[in-house]
Amino acid sequence: ELSRLPGINFNKNLQYLLNYPHACTEQITSQGFPLLFIFDFTRQTDEEKTRNSEKVDEIIRILSSRQLPDGGFMYWSGDHYASEWVSTYAGHFLTEARQKGFEVSEVVLSKWVQFQQKLARNWTPTNPYRNYYSLSMPQLQQAYRLYSLVRAENTESGAMNRLRELKDLSIQARWQLAAAYALTGKKDVANELIFNQS
């Protein structure tokens, strides 16, 4: 090994991930994300590839079943309202899954994009939508939403520019927004967000 960091026991951690017992939408999404990229970091047998791909397909089905008519995703099965953060996270996962070649419903993604666009366009720093996430990190939530839309090839430039103009933009939101700008090819704006913090 060339790294000074201790090795990661992928097999042990993957087994834990595959058998993770918790089932809110955020936890299910967290279970799925590493499975999308594990093929990039480890060699796997055909059996392991099949098992991991089947798990991703299962997660896609579960997440799709938790989408509400407005396009957002519920935090817990049976909820009747969308969680903004979880909607961004679940939709981001579904976008990445589709880009990795997994089958994701166009209807699910389209409804999610519309939900995200509506929230992105109507977002203000004093957003009246109140829950744990929006009270604790509204700027990061908006920056991540904008990033996820860029990943889904539905850039909201106006909303990105409005967020960028905030005087007290948090460091976390700056970095997330910088990533969104970088993906759109505006690396100069991304660098300005990161290095010119005033």
Predicted regions and their residues:
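Primarily extracytoplasmic ectodomains and periplasmic/lumenal surface modules that are beta-strand-rich
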Residues: 8, 188-189
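Extended, solvent-exposed functional surface patches
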Residues: 1-136, 142-147, 151, 157-161, ...
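Solenoid-repeat scaffolds in large eukaryotic assemblies
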Residues: 157-160, 189-193
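Solenoid-like repeat scaffolds
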Residues: 133, 161-171, 195-198
